[in-house]
Amino acid sequence: MEKDNDFKDPFLASTEEEELDPATQKALMEYLGVGSRASSLVSFSSTAVDIPPISGVGDFVREFRIESRKLWKLAGPAIFTTMSQYSLGAVTQVFAGHISTLALAAVSIENSVIAGFSFGIMLGMGSALETLCGQAFGAGKVSMLGVYLQRSWVILSVTALFLSLIYIFAAPILTFIGQTAAISAMAGIFSIYMIPQIFAYAINFPTAKFLQSQSKIMVMAGISGVVLVIHSFFTWLVMSRLHWGLPGLALVLNTSWWVIVVAQLVYIFNCTCGEAWSGFTWEAFHNLWGFVKLSLASAAMLCLEIWYFMALVLFAGYLKNAEVSVAALSICMNILGWAAMVAFGTNAAVSVRVSNELGASHPRTAKFSLVVAVILSTAIGMFIAAGLLFFRNEYPVLFVEDEEVRNVVRELTPMLAFCIVINNVQPVLSGVAVGAGWQAVVAYVNIACYYLFGVPFGLLLGFKLEYGVMGIWWGMVTGTFVQSIVLTWMICKTNWEKEASMAEERIKEWGGVPAEKETLLN
């Protein structure tokens, strides 16, 4: 297949595929490591054969039903998991709002700026496993998953040590970037309390991607759901009965994240993952540089997305009446985050489907999975937005006591509803990029669309033209819309047959495959 043909195939078109003779097929299967045991594992997440070309409405509807069921088996538990884990911080923020407006602003700034900065790096670096584990699992190289997991633990734990310095010096950092003295001081104290959380991230994110790549999502959902219930109870206890204030909120939030980590590790170590986990190995320290490169590319891609909306809250701190602006916008970002968890759940599902199918050399199934995911995500986003508009006068009461903040939130609700629809589709497109291994390319797209276009446009509307919070938000959402258009164009023009053939090369380059398997069918 020609190298210059990456973006020439119609999106759902038929392609001629060469038939391999039986001897070549056998050699290929041996090379890929797909024996009877491995192939049974592959079939759990990928289709037995690639779907036939879509040639009409009837074919589309039939395959849509089939793929929808496969996606929802993954997306349903993934959505529940992401919403439960996101709600840990959201519950903390809700209780902070009942302390004072300053406490809400401080916790919001810590969550959005300090923790948000670290969260983006750690989750992004952990997302390298979505590509490697997903494609390796699809190709039948199940035994490598545990090695990849341990490499990611090593890299992220070292990263957490460096990032903890940001937590320690959060107060002067926030003051330097222009936050008020009161917000900076309180957010700085809360940041120091939250240092244990970043080390939980270092273990949790790779572990979650390891389980996710094998479609073991139900156990993640169960753990997260139970922890959320416990977290909500103890947060209420330390705030409403013990009156421990911000230290109590930090104690409960840190503990909740570590309970999730320990529970997932117990599940893995209890021999529930078969060949995927065979114990600790020194091989985890081999080929770290190749793994670091993919981890950094993944981090760059995701951080540029997460920091983008983190910057929105930061810019609001420069407006007049900063405490009210930050508090109101943080409530909207909180709700947007909840809604985004649905999209991130679909992101996780489509990333698993795309990476597994590319690893199994099923390009048509991989790209059709994307089509289904985009349709479902758009419909869900519109449903959530409609409900939010209907209850726009009621829901602010749940977050804050200050009536001035509530009124600003009500004014921002139409913008929030529109943003939910856009942001429900964008993570799905990013999920395809992760599943296919395009992290580095998408990072450049994000820089151009978000930071060279969206941020300047938002600042122009918000400060120069004096539209305030609404103007900043409109400008930045426009950047997200442009990025989604670019990703859609890339996906539609991609040669998916070549992506499938490149999956094995990515596994070798980024994951480290034994040298004796370096050549395919000499």
Swiss-Prot record:
Disrupted-gene phenotype: Short root hairs.
Pfam families per the UniProt record, alphabetical: MatE
GO molecular function: antiporter activity; xenobiotic transmembrane transporter activity
A GO-annotated cellular component: membrane
GO annotation terms (biological process): root hair elongation; xenobiotic detoxification by transmembrane export across the plasma membrane
Membrane-crossing residue ranges in chain numbering: 89-109, 113-133, 154-174, 183-203, 217-237, 249-269, 299-319, 324-344, 371-391, 415-435, 441-461, 471-491
Presence of the UniProt keyword Glycoprotein in the record: no
Cross-referenced InterPro entries: MATE_euk, MATE_fam
Alphabetic keyword roster: Membrane, Transmembrane, Transmembrane helix, Transport
Subcellular compartments: Membrane
Membrane topology of the entry: Multi-pass membrane protein
Signal peptide bounds: none
Similarity remark: Belongs to the multi antimicrobial extrusion (MATE) (TC 2.A.66.1) family.
Protein function: Positively mediates root hair elongation.
Protein name from the UniProt record: Protein DETOXIFICATION 31
Native organism: Arabidopsis thaliana (Mouse-ear cress)
